[in-house]
Amino acid sequence: KSKNIIKDETINKIKVRSQKVIDLPPKDLRKLVDIGKKELGEGIIIVFAIKDGKIGLAVGVTDKLTNKYDAVKFVKTGSEIVGGKGGGGRSDFAQAGGIEENKIDDAFNKLKSLI
């Protein structure tokens, strides 16, 4: 079973990276988002990390897209689906948590539908 699953796609002309990582501490999420931003150049990065039964969610939006997309809105929506609350950050990077691992795919689908 892979511990790091990355899927890059284009949704409505915007590059989107969905990433799910097993055994990653939530504090390392920002690093993955930064790498994703560099590799995509421009786009939206959605990362879920699972460690010790807890879920971390981080969303990054590259600078040119922050006038249209807000990372905070994405993490609030995503964390509600996985049983978390709130979350916060800035329009270009936001983070939240959750507990329902089996809902991660639902959260990915919902977040992609917002793009």
Segments (PLM) and residue ranges:
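Hard-cation-handling environments
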Residues: 1-14
